[in-house]
Amino acid sequence: MNKFDEFIESNEKDLDVDTSTRNSIISMSPVRKTGRKIRSASSNGYRLEHHRTSSAGSMHSQRLMTPTRLNDQDHPLQAKPDARRVVTRHSSVSVPNAMSKRRSLIQPMVVPTTPESQNNLPSVSHSEGSYGIPLESTTVLSSEQAMASGLRRPRNGSSQSVNSMIATTIPTNGVDVSALLQSLATKELELLECKQKIEDLKKQTQHEEQNYTRRARELHELKEQVSKHLDPSLNTPVKNRAFSPVYQNIPLESRTENAGNSSLPSSVSKPKNMGHQSTNQSRSVSPQDIQERRQRDDSSDSSKQSLWSKPLALFNQFDKIIQHEIERTLNWDDSLSGTPEVQEGTPTSNSESSAQQYDNEAPGARQKSPSQGSVSRSLWSFVSDVKAGLLGIEEENDNDVITDNRCDPVYKSDRQHEQKKSTHKITNRGQAEDSGDDSSLNMRKFKTTTKFQKDNAGNNSLTDESGHRTREKKVKEVVTS
């Protein structure tokens, strides 16, 4: 036993009071002088007598019963259904802990009692029976005091428990908020890292694209170099290339005659070169492929010649018809002059006769010369005619043509005139080839108004000797009008 228990027992001995139990509801019976024993209440689980042995060895009986706990339901602190209840807060403390702390809750009160006051004390009957309390000195706790003390204690305990709960919840809430803030910061850092990674990947992709374009350019240049080494014709200029069968079969005379018309072969050869380069770029070039291609080109020369000869001949014939109609429409002063047809129509008749002679000689020339040569000549003649007739006529050589047309029709026949013109062209061909002039080539000139007036002036100067002055006057009147 400790000192506290010894102190309580000594006080109990002095006061003859048992304070071992405490209940919020106390059943009191009228105090009797006779100290008879407490009657049995075995149904409630209480012992009849509780004897204590003092230090002297004498036994004395306690006036209050000491409960013995049989089970949780028979505990004396268990609330009875018909007893008054004191509102208390149910704490989370277990029952054994409450039983161990019951001694600290004892608040003994010493109240002196007298016989008069004992008679005035109300008799409070317990639901199970009345118990006898001695008169000498007893601890009387009224129900109001017990209830007040019982209410005071739970209130204090509840306030303490609430404060303890608040103290415990605040740190937990603080921990939760800090954890949330920490998780928020980590998420923000993760997002920043992801954004930085995305930017790095974008920069890397741009760098890789630039490398890809640079390598593709280098590969293209290497392909061109390899194709140039394997195919020497690509290194030569366009004029000297021999892989074009059409350009190879064109005679040298036609090439020199049309030196000024270099735009057409260049424009024709550019698509071929582009197509050839595209084929070289699209697939790897090998010497076997080049040889096979050349063999196919050589074998297809005859088919190409027959393919292009008929359309070009038809096109040349159509061009002659158009030129004849234009010359006839430009000869507008035939109806106004009223002179004989022989004198007025000498220039046009010469051109018509030359056209007929060319038509008559063209089939023979085509039969004599190779088919490819005729096709090339007709093509270059058509180009020259278009250039001379539609783009303008070079008038610096008009005097030579006028003298030829002025002298030949009067004194020579048409056949001799054509022979003289052909000899004149042959003598001047070398000069035309060197200078690139198209005036002395085999090209037909359109009869414009100015040239026709000059021809008429020349014819009038010849016919004035025979006394024909009226024609010159009429022509001047027509021109002035």
From Swiss-Prot:
Source domain of life: Eukaryota
Pfam families reported in the protein's UniProt record: TDA11 (PF17084)
Feature: compositional bias, Polar residues: 257-287, 332-359, 368-377
Regions annotated as coiled coil: 179-231
Skewed-composition ranges (Basic and acidic residues): 290-301, 403-421, 465-481
Keywords: Coiled coil, Cytoplasm, Phosphoprotein
Phosphoprotein listed as a keyword: yes
Modified residues (Phosphothreonine): T236
One GO location term (cellular component): cytoplasm
Region (Disordered): 30-62, 252-306, 332-377, 400-481
Modification type Phosphoserine: residues: S244, S286
Cited InterPro entries: Tda11
Subcellular location: Cytoplasm
Family to which the UniProt record says this protein belongs: Belongs to the TDA11 family.
Name used for this protein in its record: Topoisomerase I damage affected protein 11
Native species: Saccharomyces cerevisiae (strain AWRI1631)
